[in-house]
């Protein structure tokens, strides 16, 4: 859309290439910066909107913001930074991206040491939100806390990689933090 700093489409989890997206009337919502933050922090719905693969970005934004090199989950921080530099987004309700789960994907493998980088990403977002968008600091903090529980949940669902030697110490850290965040 003309004037938008980035555009996004809906995604659908698919099991095979024959799966058809639901048919619905095409609608494009134009969001201001507040609307973008609401969407990023899942205040408007419970979908995850902080990945890069369902978006197209205006070149000028990409000259100001870079991916956090070498990090897993780098697109989460990237999109947080994009919103800080954007004024308008065009969001389509049409499914144009199909997310195929496979057993060897990062999402479905056992926990590895690099999964702990999610905590570092959300910690940085929580710190940056104090300056960039203070009204969302609580939401950023909740996502930081949720990252701890998410790694524990992944370990229960998919197990832990045999190569993760520090898992027991990290597991104890995650349990202690989760208890403090949610039960103290």
Question: Model regions: which residues?
Answer:
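Donor-binding/catalytic cores of nucleotide-activated saccharide
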Residues: 1-90, 100, 104-113
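Membrane-interface aromatic/basic loop that binds lipid-linked glycans or pyrophosphate carriers
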Residues: 3-4, 158-184
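C-terminal, non-catalytic tails of nucleotide-sugar-dependent glycosyltransferases
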Residues: 34, 120-141, 177-184
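Alpha-helical elements of Rossmann-like donor-binding domains used by nucleotide-donor carbohydrate transfer enzymes
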Residues: 81, 120, 124, 169-173
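Glycine- and acidic-residue-rich phosphate-binding/metal-coordinating active-site segment common to enzymes
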Residues: 90, 95-132
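Secondary-structure edge/capping motif, primarily at the C-terminal ends of alpha-helices
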Residues: 103, 129-133, 154-162
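Short, charged, amphipathic alpha-helical segments
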Residues: 137-143, 165-169
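Amphipathic alpha-helical repeat scaffolds of TPR domains
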Residues: 142-154
